[in-house]
Design a protein with these regions (language model features):
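N-terminal beta1-alpha1-beta2 module of alpha/beta enzyme domains
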Residues: 1-62, 165, 271-279, 283
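Short, acidic/polar
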Residues: 15-27, 82-86, 169-179, 246-258
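Internal, glycine-rich beta/alpha segment that forms the wall or movable "lid"
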Residues: 2, 76-183, 198-207, 211, ...
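Catalytic domains of carbohydrate-active enzymes, especially glycoside hydrolases
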Residues: 21-38, 182-186, 257-266
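An alpha-helical appendage that flanks or caps ligand/catalytic pockets
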Residues: 119-160, 190-293
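Active-site mouth loops of central-metabolism enzymes
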Residues: 6-18, 73-81, 162-172, 235-249
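Acidic (Asp/Glu)-rich catalytic clusters
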Residues: 25-29, 56-65, 87-97, 181-182, ...
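Hydrophobic faces of well-ordered beta-strands that scaffold small-molecule active sites
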Residues: 4-8, 35-37, 68-71, 98-102, ...
C-alpha cells in the first residue's frame, strides 16, 4: 500500500505559531503516514519558515504515531557533528519516528549567508552523511573526511533507531542516486510521474553495479495537490497530481500509477492558504486514502 503523508509548508501566518502543530495533530487523527517539513534559512516570502528539526521536535510532542520527515535538510549548512547530534536527539524524543531527508540544496544566498561555498555542496553532503552514519553506528568513533575529522568521538545523544534514523536522499542527478545507494535508506523525488519513477528505479539498478544496495531503498516523492473547491495560494512548482482540475478519481489513478512504478511513500504538498489546510486533509482522507490499496 502506498503510504501517504502531507507537507507542513511555510505558509503559516507569522502571528499564529500553533497552526502547524494543529495541522500535524489533525493529520495524525486522519491516519496520514507522515508530515514533512522543508529547510529554509532565509525568508521564502510564503510565511513562517521554521527550522525543520525544531518544528518537528514540537510536532513529536503533540503526536504519537505520525512519522516525521524532513524534506529535505540541506546537509552542508550544518557541521557533520551538529547534524548527527540534532537528528539523533529528534530520533530519541520522537520514539524513532524521524525520517531524515537530505539534499545538497540550491540557494546561493543561503550558502553565502552560512559561509559555505556552494561549489562544495556535493562533497560536503557526502562527508557529513558518512560522518553521521559513523557517529550513529559506534561509540567512540574515528572518522577522516575532507571536511570532518573525529577522534574517539562519542555522540552526545545516541539514536534510538539502530544505526540512526533512516536517510532519504533527495535529487534526480546521477550523483544524488549514487549518494542514495551509498548512504541512503530511500530516495526522495519531487513532482514525479510514473515514467520518471520507473526511470529512477532503472538508473538505481544500473548504478548499483550488483552490490544489492538498491534493494533496501524506499522510493518516495513529494507531489503537488490542490484539492477541488480550494483555491491555490501559490503556483505549484511542478506537475499537479490528478491534473489541472483534479478529482478523487484522477488523483487515485495518478497515485496508483506511481505505486505500480515502484513508489511506496508519497507526500502531498498543498499550495494553498493555511486556513484551508485541514479542509484539504479532510478531503484527501475521505476521498483518496480509502481507495489506496
Amino acid at each position: 500500500m502506498l503510504r501517504l503523508g502531507v507537507s507542513l509548508q511555510p505558509r503559516w501566518p507569522i502571528d499564529d505559531e500553533t497552526a502547524a502543530l494543529r495541522a500535524a495533530s489533525h493529520a495524525e487523527d486522519l491516519d496520514f503516514d507522515h508530515v514533512a517539513v522543508g529547510n529554509r534559512l532565509l525568508d521564502s516570502g510564503f510565511g513562517l519558515d521554521a527550522d525543520p528539526l525544531v518544528l518537528l521536535s514540537a510536532v513529536s510532542a503533540v503526536t504519537t504515531r505520525l512519522r516525521l520527515l524532513i524534506s529535505v535538510l540541506v546537509a552542508p549548512y550544518y557541521p557533520a557533528l551538529v547534524l548527527a547530534n540534532q537528528a539523533a536527539t529528534l530520533d530519541v524524543i520522537s520514539g524513532g519516528r524521524l525520517i531524515l531527508g537530505v539534499g545538497t540544496g540550491w540557494n546561493p544566498e543561503e550558502y553565502d549567508a552560512v559561509g559555505v561555498p556552494a561549489r562544495e555542496r556535493g562533497a560536503r553532503t557526502d562527508d557529513h552523511l558518512a560522518a553521521a552514519k559513523a557517529l550513529w553506528a559506534q561509540r567512540p568513533t574515528d572518522f577522516d573526511g575532507p571536511f570532518t575529522t573525529l577522534r574517539a568521538a562519542r555522540l552526545g545523544v545516541p539514536p534510538v533507531t539502530p544505526g540512526g534514523p533512516p536517510v532519504w536522499v533527495g535529487g534526480h542527478s546521477d550523483a544524488a542516486l549514487l549518494r542514495a545507494l551509498r548512504f541512503g535508506d530511500g530516495w526522495y523525488g519531487t513532482g514525479v510521474t510514473a515514467a520518471e519513477v520507473s526511470g529512477v528505479g532503472r538508473r538505481l539498478r544500473e548504478l548499483d553495479r550488483g552490490t544489492g544496495n538498491v534493494e533496501r531503498l524506499t522510493l518516495a516523492s513529494a507531489v503537488f495537490l490542490t484539492p477541488p473547491g480550494i483555491a491555490a495560494a501559490v503556483p505549484a512548482p511542478g506537475r499537479p497530481l490528478g491534473g489541472a482540475a483534479p478529482t478523487a478519481a484522477s488523483v487515485v489513478d495518478d497515485l496508483g500509477r506511481l505505486a505500480e512504478a515502484g513508489l511506496t511513500a508519497c507526500t502531498a504538498w498543498l499550495p494553498i492558504a493555511a486556513e484551508h489546510v485541514e479542509k484539504a486533509m479532510d478531503w484527501i482522507a475521505a476521498e483518496v486514502i480509502p481507495q489506496l490499496t
